[in-house]
């Protein structure tokens, strides 16, 4: 019977095995293949040219499909942000854990249980160096010790198997709008601490529904709270101005 733990181990060990098999005839030292898994929100089966799309050109992803494996049959029990990431990293149905079966806020605790076997932790056991870049959205801190963006941020990605992480906590449209490297906010001025919550605004900080004419993007009802970089977000945030990202520069930041 293929259990969750067996599945994750076979994924980790299998990648190393195929790397060794490719070099065995030449009697050279075993080499492990690099593994890059790209998860992109809001991209459907018909959005890539390699699957027949025409409106938006996707040459880099088309090349990956051409040089790798292109799947044509996939299923998802929860096709939204946090549950998808939870299942990918743990090999577990997200609905088996009430902390991982819904879209999380930027102040939610880590949804992956302490000590759980994860794909990156098993890859590390197989000799890989592991890292993640981009959207995290699996929670930070614990219920007993909520995340403090002004101090050490833990537990987080580096506590579930990643050697290095450069990421943002929730989503691009949710606060806090700052980058985190491993366990600290990047570029934070300690004299301008970050405050984050989702139930009420901070003092006289403007919200999107209050200043609609000053926004870069028209706000809808759900995106009408904190304003960062001229864009109205979900949730409320104050402080951390030196650490706030610029949306237009985000792609360049992640690819440096």
Label for each model-derived stretch:
Residues 2-256:
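Formylglycine-dependent sulfatase
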